[in-house]
Amino acid sequence: MVDFVVDLTDAELVADTLWSLGVVAIEEISNDGNVTLRTSMGENPQDTIASLRDTFPHVEVSTVEIDRAVADTWRDFAEPTHVVNDVYLVPAWKDAPPGSRAIFIEPLDTFGLGNHPTTVLALRLALRCVQPRSTVFDFGSGSGVLSVGAASLLSCTCSAYDIADSAKDALTVNAAENNVTTCNWIPGFPANTVDAVLANILAPVLIAESLNVMQTTQTGGVIILSGMRTEQAAEVLRHYSQCSEITRDELDGWTAVALKKN
């Protein structure tokens, strides 16, 4: 387990950022003027910690040993997450709602269930804007929710990448959970352009990698940007000058935007 000690005024935003990075549970422990956010990040949490510190450099970080059975109690309380219409993201050990089109997700020790607003928004816009049977690159793939969702629901051929070492295993597991054979892992941006890029990652990375994201997308292709707080969207979009906005959606203070590459 990893402890993040933050000022009381920053606790909600830091916790929200941890959710967006894919953690599956957070325990909040109140101290004198501070809050400790305790969460599991698997065996190699360094990349996720580095991403958080890019945005919150003053956060104090430490590791603690917790009994595995205690750490996994969150699984008893996990529930399906509604995305849009009849589409749900469902924990792999739970039953799907009757009549739903379900994407089953096993987060392993590192990633989330896809129930954070950034993932819900990204998948919602992908289902709305990406054409069936497209080629798709999932940038910041985490547990593979977007790749597996696009492959399963839109018959897309997907490649995925995330800086976290365990993301490759998560993609493999969740593709198998959903009988998907058209998702593959690659060690970075693809060599060839694709019809659509799904980028669900923090705003500083969306900005830093904007040229790579645009260069990876075919002319006329779709870019889905998620991981932005609503107040960050304008600054992120300023770096995507080769694109025009198709639509956007908001949920719980987060914004996702669908763009067309001009």
Predicted regions located by residue number:
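Amphipathic, non-transmembrane alpha-helical secondary structure
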Residues: 16, 120-127, 207, 211
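Conserved SAM/SAH cofactor-binding pocket of Class I
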Residues: 109-190
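Hydrophobic residues in well-ordered beta-strands that form the structural core
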Residues: 90-91, 160, 225
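N-terminal auxiliary segments of SAM/dcSAM-dependent transferases
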Residues: 1-97
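SAM-dependent Rossmann-like transferase core, predominantly class I methyltransferases
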Residues: 70-132
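S-adenosylmethionine
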Residues: 163-262
